[in-house]
Curated annotation (Swiss-Prot):
E.C. number: 3.2.1.17
Function: Has antibacterial activity.
Family classification: Belongs to the dictyostelium lysozyme family.
InterPro entries on file: Diverse_Func_Domain-Protein (IPR052258)
Signal peptide residues on this chain, from the entry's feature table: 1-19
UniProt GO MF annotations: lysozyme activity
Official protein name in the record: Lysozyme D
Gene Ontology CC annotation, any one: vesicle lumen
Length: 260
């Protein structure tokens, strides 16, 4: 019985850990790769001694993960209840368009012939025969086209906050245990996005996190609501910042013209 329980636990651990694979392990015990869909679990921490030199008590909105983004980088973190995104493209919801057109034409021709004979009789007799042929042809055509469109804009996506990276981590073993990449952040972020003073990986509170700027037109030091259109703008800005960053390990994204 013990052997069976041990095997079940081993299979469970292997299944969970198999869900996450870091493509770029770094610094011996951390992961430097950024998920292609920008999705993470949110956890909370507060350390006075940090890799970037800024204590947690000096900031209200802060994160770790400097091994991924660099020290002092602004991140926009959003609850993902409204959707998800993938780096390399943007999508939108809350909008719809439709259009259509059609045309048709047809022609036809035909011919036929037939002959027959028959007899009937019991007390009388007779015969008859006949033949005939005919043909007909015709053609016709019709065409039409039409188009229409409908659009809805401004659909609510979710709640976001901006934060500054001040520390490295978490350990890659924690992410492997969680089965997903992790953003370790301040308790205020957990409170603003999920209404809780602390978040653990077992809570499975999903977020997206991307590089951003304090000058992109969105609020700082407080949570803010975003529409799908807003969120697509956030993602577009993050791509611009990433493409123009010359030093991936220490990039503060503070010199760019962004979408506002």
């Amino acid at each position: 019985m013990r052997l069976l329980v041990t095997l079940i636990l081993l299979i469970f651990v292997l299944t969970v850990s198999g869900q996450y694979s870091c493509s770029n392990p770094c610094y011996g015990n951390m992961c430097c790769s950024i998920p292609s869909n920008n999705e993470y679990y949110l956890t909370t921490f507060c350390d006075e001694s940090t890799a970037c030199g800024t204590p947690c008590s000096a900031q209200t909105y802060f994160t770790a993960d400097s091994q991924r983004f660099g020290c002092g980088v602004t991140l926009t973190i959003c609850s993902t209840s409204g959707g998800s995104t993938t780096t390399g493209g943007t999508g939108s919801a809350g909008t719809s368009t439709s259009s259509g057109s059609g045309s048709g034409s047809g022609s036809g021709s035909g011919s036929g012939s037939g002959s027959g004979s028959g007899t009937s009789g019991s007390s009388s007799s007779g015969s008859s025969s006949g033949s005939g042929s005919g043909s007909s042809s015709g053609s016709g055509g019709s065409s039409g086209s039409g188009s229409g469109s409908t659009m809805e804009t401004g659909g609510f996506y979710g709640v976001c906050v901006k934060a500054i990276t001040i520390d490295a981590g978490p350990n890659i073993s924690v992410e492997e245990e969680a089965g997903m990449a992790i953003i370790d952040a301040s308790s205020q972020i957990c409170q603003d996005l999920f209404g809780s003073s602390s978040c653990g990986w077992s809570d499975k509170r999903s977020i997206t996190a991307v590089q951003s700027s304090v000058e992109d037109g969105f609020p700082v030091n407080k949570p803010f609501n975003v529409t799908f259109e807003d969120y697509n703008k956030i993602i577009s800005n993050s791509l611009i910042l990433d493409q123009q960053c010359s030093n991936k390990n220490n990039c503060k994204y503070n010199k760019l013209e962004l979408m506002k």
